[in-house]
Amino acid sequence: VSVTRPDLPPAPPAAVAEATSPYTRQQHGRAAFTLFQDAPSHDELHILKSAARATAKHMEASLSIPTATSQRQIPAKLLIENRALINAHLARTVGGKVSFTHLIGYALVEALCEMPDLNVRYTIEGGKPAVEHLAHIGFGLAIDVADAQGNHSLKVPVIHDADTLTFAEFVDAYQDLVARARTATLTTADFQGASVTLTNPGTLGTTTSVPRLMVGQGLIIGVGATDYPAEFRGVSPKRLAALGIGKTMFFSSTYDHRIIQGAASGRLLALVDAKLSGRDGFYERVFTSMHVPARPYAWEADYDYDPNHEKGKPARITELIHAYRSRGHLAADTDPLAYRVRRHPDLDLSS
């Protein structure tokens, strides 16, 4: 039975998206020649050179390490808000920005200082297995570098003696390595001495990963994307706030199982979680190092609020607004010659 009307013109052709597979495009139409001129038409063999060849050798050597991985999901709200406070201060003063990786990396350094038994490497001494306890932390930083042709390579330079640096010094050393990696001016010494590495595939949207552990290191930490849980991505911001849904991130700790056990790896991730949640004065130390004249936000548990029966919350918000209007100058940074944190109890959000 026909369901079309003969007196109507034929329907226009449906719009079909161009094929994305190079094979499909080469078999069906001109898209292969018009969209991707550099798409190969036959198999090609390229010899790995320089950094790519070194990476391949290190990856093959890493297969000799028996590894295991611990993972932990942590809330990112406090990290996001305190980073915004720091960057707002920097924008008003000396310029620059602090990244999530800066804060996470320094929290990891502090955690390893508190758990020195994890700052170790496996070695052979006199033909027998041994563990070397390192006096200082060699902090490896995985950097994705693109050349002029758009080819990407991985470089892992090292911040030497990271445990001896303040947060501000750590940020400067971090930025120096990144800048020299981008300009191909790193030296051989910059790649030696790592005891732990931090890799952040979360910048690409990766939720979690299990990175390879290189020979000579005890563990490698992976950081996932900072985002809302996938099941809530379609929810409006207002609804997310009403539900108390915040952004989270996954951490992974891949370690040499010959010298580090799973319980210790789990405690390390718990300690990093505690620091990024502000439970041991971590943000106070960071703010002091960066000369931020403000009190960092603190982690507080949420509570239910019924606007139909509880009238106290709007009144307290009004009082806080009035306090800032009338006494906000008491917390202002008005001394250009010295760093001083000014506080007033009426201006505290927790009040």
Language-model segments: residues:
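C-terminal catalytic/motor cores of large multi-domain enzyme assemblies
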Residues: 1-314, 327, 334
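Extended, highly charged clamp/arch subdomains and adjacent linkers
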Residues: 305-351
